[in-house]
Amino acid sequence: MRLIVMGDLHYHDTDAAIAGWTEARDRFYETMIGKFLEEEGDFHISLGDLTNYGTATELAGVYGLLGQASRTFVHALGNHDLYAQKRADVLAITGQKRYHSIDTERATLVFLDTAKEQDFEDWGGWVDEEQLRWLEGVVQASGAKPMLVFAHHPVYRTTKRSEMDKGSIHHSIDMWSVLGQKQGVGVYFNGHTHVDSIHRERNWTFVQLSAVLDQHAVRLVDVESDCIRIAAKDVEEAGVLESAPTLYAHMPHFRHNPEARGGAEDRECVVSLTAATQA
């Protein structure tokens, strides 16, 4: 099974009065999303902040691009996706579920909603008690089958910057009380902090993707019989490289991070399933 995963995309509205901005926006995202969809996979996954403010026009624009190929696309909500509209309205437009799981032959896939609704002061993550108890049931039911979790916010004090204020699911929420019940291997994918990072703790591997605007790349996740292989694939087309500086200069609610790219150890890894089975 192969999964294609991308970090924060921040597809955004533009001001037509600013020369070249709309054209650069269209060229960047048409190229980037085209390369994302070009990759063959069983699921194509966004880790949230698919849009920059969650307006109806942003959602229509990005989903229009995503709909140009026949792919199974799953969108985990990010805080930026819920600024302009309420959660229910966003989900009505996208047709996505708030949180859910998919049980496959190779692994259990879990998609969380860690975003607060229209909270302009606190962009940190939150998981309510109902969702936490639901997740606990999914973890328990998965047994020793590998579990891959996809969420926007990291778990507190795991990947880089997850210890910062508003940089993770709130520290008062004991995610380990649920994740710690997992038998076998778990892999947790997230975005939000705009920096590449991989952290291993207990039987979990935490894989954090930087924003697509900063590091023009996706992750290829292959779930095999004996391991999970996570590889980075850069997008180096001119439509992306030449357009990005214009977006940095004009788009609101986003600050370019020139230090987003990590080393190889922050972007790629292999998670053994054999060792977990033997243990």
Report each predicted region and the residues it spans.
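N-terminal active-site segment of His-dependent metallophosphoesterases
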Residues: 1-60
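Active-site-proximal beta-strand elements of phosphoester/diester hydrolases
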Residues: 1-15, 106-116, 148-150, 205-210, ...
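Acidic/histidine-rich helix-loop elements
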Residues: 5-28, 83-93, 117-127, 164, ...
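Active-site neighborhood of phospho(di)ester-bond hydrolases with catalytic His/Asp-centered motifs
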Residues: 5-7, 43-49, 73-79, 113, ...
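Active-site environment of divalent metal-dependent phosphoester hydrolases
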Residues: 12-15, 52-57, 79-86, 117-122, ...
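Active-site-proximal segments of metal-dependent phosphoesterases and phosphodiesterases across multiple
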Residues: 17, 142-186
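Binuclear metal-dependent phosphoesterase catalytic core
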Residues: 23, 178, 196-279
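Extended active-site neighborhood of metal-dependent phosphoesterases/phosphodiesterases
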Residues: 56-136, 141, 174-177, 181-184, ...
